[in-house]
Amino acid sequence: MTPNIHTVILDIEGTTTPISFVHDVLFPYIRDNLVRHINQKWGSEELKQDIKELYKLYLEDNKASELVVNNQFNTPEILNPDDESTDKEKLIESVIRNVIYQMDNDRKSTPLKQLQGHMWLEGYENELVKGVVFPEVPKAFENWNLNHIDIYIYSSGSIAAQKLLFNYSNFGSLLPYIKGHFDTTIGGKLHPSSYEKILSTINNGSPNSYLFVTDSILEAKAARESGLNVCLSIRDGNPPIVDRELLNTFDQVSSFDQLFNKFNFKN
């Protein structure tokens, strides 16, 4: 018998949002506007803090590469922003090299996310960027809210970035529908303990009254191990899931509309 679901936890990339959005819209926006952003914001406390955090990360990487054999980060040097003798243009060039290097290597460091978050906020507010969700997502959110089903987001993107995407979506602000957000500060998405922490934080009944929807079979496996109901999002453009045997042990949908035929949403 299918249990009643009263809490839905959603991934973003490949689930609520085309997986291409981040790589085709958000990341290119950073690359295209990084020089302008740094020059326009130069001297602001926000940018000073962003650069300080990037510099601290560079020092940590440099120290780690010296201490650990064959663990060379090769992170490009950032000049000391607190050294008054540092040439402004050379400092800017070093920051740009470092940021682009991290993005080229798909690094998800906290300082990089912080800078990106500030840039995306500016982009969204000035309508240079608009969040994208699949067409049926707003209706699903509305249906869940009407039936008193709580909606949470759990994504590797920062909570700030999550809120921007849903607040400035192509269907208007969807934030009022969402009760809460989680990112990797609560734990990695491949670890069952992360989902257990989320359950403990929400604290709204037994694990089998929750549904987690994701496009990642490894995330699905981790969530299931923590007791959640899980459904895989199989969307056009998502990376193919190679392990067909494991895939077939999960419910699968290609649209949120299909979730309402597979699960009982009742609170």
Curated annotation (Swiss-Prot):
Cystine bridges? none
Which reactions appear under catalytic activity for this entry?
5-methylsulfanyl-2,3-dioxopentyl phosphate + H2O = 1,2-dihydroxy-5-(methylsulfanyl)pent-1-en-3-one + phosphate
Tell me one GO molecular function of this protein: acireductone synthase activity
The residues that hold Mg(2+) are 11, 13, 215
GO CC term, one of those recorded: nucleus
The enzyme class is hydrolase
Q: Required co-factor?
A: Mg(2+)
Binding partners and assembly: Monomer.
Q: Which family does it belong to?
A: Belongs to the HAD-like hydrolase superfamily. MasA/MtnC family.
Tell me what this protein is called. Enolase-phosphatase E1
Q: Report the source organism.
A: Dictyostelium discoideum
